[in-house]
Amino acid sequence: MWIADKWKDYEVIDCSGGEKLERWVITHWYARTRRSSGIPRKKKKAGSIGTVTTTAAKKAGGEWEFFDLPEQWQIHYGELTFNLKPFSFKHTGLFPEQATNWDWFGDKIRNAGRPIKVLNLFAYTGGATLAAAAAGAHVTHVDASKGMVAWAKENAASSGLSDKPIRWLVDDCVKFVEREIRRGNHYDAIIMDPPSYGRGPKGEIWKIEMPFIHLLSCVLRFFLRIHFSS
């Protein structure tokens, strides 16, 4: 198992009872989320200036309980800067555990000895996009959400990467890949983090069970390497 332990602004404190307790440095605040494994323990009280907890709900969403939490803040990973804010469904706009993947493919890109073209599908707020661009890759960033692509651009600007060769696209990932095949375009690597459920830019419903198999069959036709970031 790879452990994302190089963060200065983030730490996993506990994993128990189907929840996860995390420390995010703003001042300091803590978050407890569902969907992790471990032995149940008693709830911990946060000793920092701002406390945030996501509580288990009947549905997967959960909710935030917080005091003095800003609407937006920044955290840093090496030379990358990310703008975060709490969502109602217990996300912050970043999955810090993915940093181990960023390090892995960043080393591959830097050591390739030639220009590398990367396609990042379901690219969200751009963590993998920025890591690949910072390592020297030409990146095509595709996400169905206009808001998420705009957020990713903000992260790029905050990281000093606005002038890097990043192509920002709001598009249906499956349809985009199908068009790229017809165009004869190729990439050296593909990164994807598909959601289990979502909607396309025109309201199309995405459920991972069906289109994902088709998407894999498409990318295997012309991509040299596939890396899953989930």
Protein language model features and the residues they cover:
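Conserved beta-strand signature within the Rossmann-like core of class I S-adenosyl-L-methionine
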Residues: 226-230
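Non-catalytic substrate-recognition/targeting regions of SAM-dependent transferases
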Residues: 6-23, 29-96, 103
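Mobile active-site "lid"/loop adjacent to the S-adenosyl-L-methionine
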Residues: 146-148, 170-174, 187-218
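Conserved alpha-helix/loop element of class I SAM-dependent methyltransferases that forms part
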Residues: 96-114
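Conserved SAM-binding motif I beta-strand of class I
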Residues: 138-143
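Conserved class I S-adenosyl-L-methionine
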Residues: 113-124
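Conserved SAM-binding loop of SAM-dependent methyltransferases across substrates and taxa
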Residues: 125-137
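S-adenosyl-L-methionine
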Residues: 145-191
